């Protein structure tokens, strides 16, 4: 009988001392439970993913010091095995580091395993820094059980063709009683179910029980949901840790089955987990909470236009930071409707936050007047429209600089895709909460926020009004863009394509196929593709956005700017 402790922690990239403190605390909890093994996530010591910090000698020295601290702490908990993820310097040709799993006990490293499969796709770029480990299975006897070890991607390629080797097959040949997989698996819609499917199938195929340990927390644009789990070959996923929160849980393992620490029964694992909208909400809230905390911000500010994007951003910010730590600024111009100002007032009253009016009409007029005096030509058309957005962006940055608030941008994925935003205007800020949500999803999540809160936080008037930038008289988004239900289906297929969930992919293909069958629809699709390509330069200069879908702008989609490919 083994006792296994899952240490699903919210570690911070680069905070070696803080991570060590968390890990030691979790190990002591495991010790109190009488555990034989405490399992941390991939690169738990350094935090995942350190990027080019791995090339800094001072950073690696701190990692080594952190490992020494863990070894020292393990001497006090002598019978406990610690499974730790860390970058480790290696010798020989190739990259200078391994992504390593270390098992330590009583002040000694008793097993070393280097990750074999290094992902270099989507948001991952591990080959930039790490050398693959040798094609061998590592197994360690702990008590009466043989325990094998894998690191994240090593388990994702079973029956796949992305790599020439299959660590799961090597593990099967080694015939351990249990496989422990440490992971740093960022979440997106459908990712939890994908993990269950892939690792459940591998466990069943090879007849190997498996413990999968993940981290939680927001790290720049990526959010990790935890949801660590245990799999039995015949029963599938039999245990799941909490999502979006730290969780230190001890299980028993009798050689073939998992059980709770204090009883033989385990809580039933839901097949489907959170709904799509509940997932979006939880992912964004944790992403903002951790981004603000790690960057030293206690407060946020949002420009409140009276539109749905800023309304949803404010509602999510309040959930993440609290009503006393979110401020809103309304900046009406000549073209702002009275309804938009009133809607902002109602929204902020519902959310319990401060709303400060800061009219910009005189600022815009003064700037336009000076422009004409200096250059001999008046500002017209798009230049005058963009001036309003840039004045608002400047006001908000002045607020951020003066009061120390994190400025949140309010652009959605539909607008960002086609460049329907003003560079150095509404793109100003430090983080975008809804930049990976299509406009139709913004509407849906706004309604969900009201339903889940049990009251109308976002006024129905905001949700129901036609979207408008209000930079010109009687302006509507549909003056420049296709209707969002049409645009979003085209964008999904163009930007995410094969990474869409099967049902969503088939719907988008069918919709776009019917659209393309007409001359008008074909022209619309071509125009949208051109808009996406032409506006890469805007996306490159935009702040990071919280990723919720399989392919988000940022590190997960790297496209050239100065190129011709359409």
What are the roles of these predicted feature ranges?
Residues 3, 207-208, 233, 263-305, ...:
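ATP/NTP-dependent adenylation/nucleotidyl-transfer catalytic domains that generate, transfer
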Residues 1-303, 314-323, 330, 355:
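Enzyme catalytic cores with a strong preference for nitrogen-chemistry domains
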